[in-house]
Amino acid sequence: MKVLAVTGYKPFELGIFKHDDKALFYIKKALENRMIALLEEGLEWVLISGQLGTELWAAEVAFSLQEEFPDLKVAVITPFLEQEKKWSEKNQEQYEAVLAASDFTESLTHRPYESPVQFKQKNRFFIEKADGLLILYDEEIEGSPVYMLNEAKKAQEKRDFPIYTITMDDLRVTVEECSFYEE
């Protein structure tokens, strides 16, 4: 696997409203654990659309892993221009920092938001270009990542397309493991 698309919940879908929420440590640790395993198998690119939450956190994790895995690259391909326009200043700063540190940035439609079709186009494009999907999602907790997941499941009908899921149970295990090692 060379290219991994990453998506998942937005912060509000997880009840996270602060950039220093303790839960972020565990979410990032779970993302890191999955990415390291894939890096050891040849992962080269992490592909995100720059959405708040899981995607930006995954980019931050990838940047931290670049010390150990210098060939790892991050691409941010947004569904439309100015997606951050209505975000808070703090969220815009995080987004701009990720864009600045990324190896490749582009907008899929080269236009501002027009309709939900742009999100559908982005989901199809990501699944078409990626070799697999890492998704922070739990079937029991509906949310925005379901659209990318459904697109990935369609791809699985036609080709080998692994979906690596981080569920709430996986996060609980991460918390327990981290707590065990802290003791």
Curated annotation (Swiss-Prot):
Gene3D superfamilies: 3.40.50.450. Belongs to the UPF0398 family. Signal peptide: none annotated. InterPro entries: YspA. This is UPF0398 protein BLi02355/BL05236. Pfam families: YpsA (PF06908).
